[in-house]
UniProtKB/Swiss-Prot annotation:
Protein name (Swiss-Prot/TrEMBL): NADH dehydrogenase [ubiquinone] 1 alpha subcomplex subunit 10, mitochondrial
GO biological process: mitochondrial electron transport, NADH to ubiquinone
Encoding gene (name): NDUFA10
Residues carrying N6-succinyllysine: 285
Similarity remark: Belongs to the complex I NDUFA10 subunit family.
Source organism: Pongo pygmaeus
High-level lineage: Eukaryota, Metazoa, Chordata, Craniata, Vertebrata
Cofactor: FAD
Presequence range in chain numbering: 1-35
Post-translational modification: Phosphorylation at Ser-250 by PINK1 is required for the binding and/or reduction of the complex I substrate ubiquinone.
Cofactor binding comment, as recorded: Binds 1 FAD per subunit.
Subunit details: Complex I is composed of 45 different subunits. This a component of the hydrophobic protein fraction.
GO cellular component, one term: mitochondrial matrix
Length: 355
């Protein structure tokens, strides 16, 4: 195989790269479309970030506990500011941006299940940590997509959660005894070698909804799996947000905090955003050269995901070579997945010999 396993050891690295939309160029053509990547010559010829980034080129993340209205607020903010909205990255985020966009089987998505986590968070098959590790990789991929969009178009982006807040779930899982200390160490090691390459958001918006209200909303929503979430787990998520995440992010970027009622008034939130000075954080220290290197990174999805695979044995996310080979071959047998887009006759691609 050309690549390593996708961070979680659930699928082959080749499967992971294809699922993430990253393809190595071979020969002259890699697809039927021209996909000239941004590089040194375009930079030297004048294609620089300063020409497209404006005061509206911002990265905004909306955070909060489960069922706090993050998606609704994020979408409304994006619409009012003219930003691009990125819905929260889930297990099937790689599927949503590749192929026909349809979700693939669990074998190709970390071999984990959110529903199973809600039903049995202490399952001894390692599902809980596989889920968390896979979701971190999905959020990492999405954050790179958001930064790539920002640097390529100059348009601001709004995300629901990010790689910077992902750890709140890990903390809650560990505090509740769902995962082992070795899993926490593995996660922190992966995070330390990946998150350091990325600039934090310009702004974090936190929706503060008390745990009893969160539980009431979950019951009203009626999802039979979510309804099994305990108040202790939700409280640990809130504690991680308030005691660790918000204090850390307040040193790196702007932070706005709203109650459940205040978050419903997106017009007022947008007004508050427009009054912010955005006078702190690492974005202020960037220039064309540093943004050039950042753009090179985020456009290369292979490199984005590369360091989420580390040589540490952890039963929860490790599989054998035979299983890896089997999953890889099964993936390659799926329609349109054997070769690069445009080169698969089984899905109707034609004139391949001319490409």
């Amino acid at each position: 195989m050309a690549l390593r396993l996708l961070k979680l050891g659930a699928t082959s690295a080749s499967v992971r790269v294809v699922a993430a939309g990253a393809q190595r160029v071979r020969g002259i053509h890699s697809s039927v479309q021209c996909k000239l990547x941004y590089g040194m010559w375009r930079f030297l010829l004048g294609d620089k970030a300063s020409k497209r980034l404006t005061e509206h080129s911002r990265v905004i993340t909306v955070d909060g506990n489960i069922c706090t209205g993050k998606g609704k607020l994020a979408k409304e903010i994006a619409e009012k500011l003219g930003f691009k909205h990125f819905p929260e990255a889930g297990i099937h985020y790689p599927d949503s941006i590749t192929g026909d966009g349809k979700p693939l089987a669990a074998d190709y998505n970390g071999n984990c299940s959110l529903e199973k986590f809600y039903d049995d968070p202490r399952s001894n098959d390692g599902n809980t940590y596989r889920l968390q590790s896979w979701l971190y990789s999905s959020r990492l991929l999405q954050y790179s997509d958001a930064l790539e969009h920002l640097l390529t178009t100059g348009q601001g982006v709004v995300l629901e959660r990010s790689i910077f807040s992902d750890f709140v779930f890990l903390d809650a899982m560990y505090n509740q005894g769902f995962i082992r200390k070795q899993c926490v160490d593995h996660y922190n090691e992966v995070k330390s070698v990946t998150i350091c390459d990325y600039l934090p958001p310009h702004l974090v918006i936190y929706i503060d909804v008390p745990v009893p209200e969160v539980q009431r909303r979950i019951q009203k929503k009626g999802d039979p799996h979510e309804m099994k979430i305990t108040s202790a787990y939700l409280q640990d998520i809130e504690n991680a947000y308030k005691k660790t995440f918000l204090p850390e992010m307040s040193e790196k970027c702007e932070v706005l905090q709203y109650s459940a009622r205040e978050a419903q008034d997106s017009k007022k939130v947008v007004e508050d955003i427009e009054y912010l000075k955005f006078d702190k954080g690492p974005w202020l220290k960037q220039d064309n050269r540093t943004l050039y290197h950042l753009r090179l990174l985020v456009q290369d999805k292979f490199e984005v995901l590369n360091y989420t695979s580390i040589p540490i044995f952890l039963p929860e996310v490790t599989i054998g070579a035979h299983q890896t080979d089997r999953v890889l071959h099964q993936f390659r047998e799926l329609p349109g997945r054997k070769y690069s887009p445009g080169y698969n006759t089984e899905v109707g691609d034609k004139w391949i010999w001319l490409k």
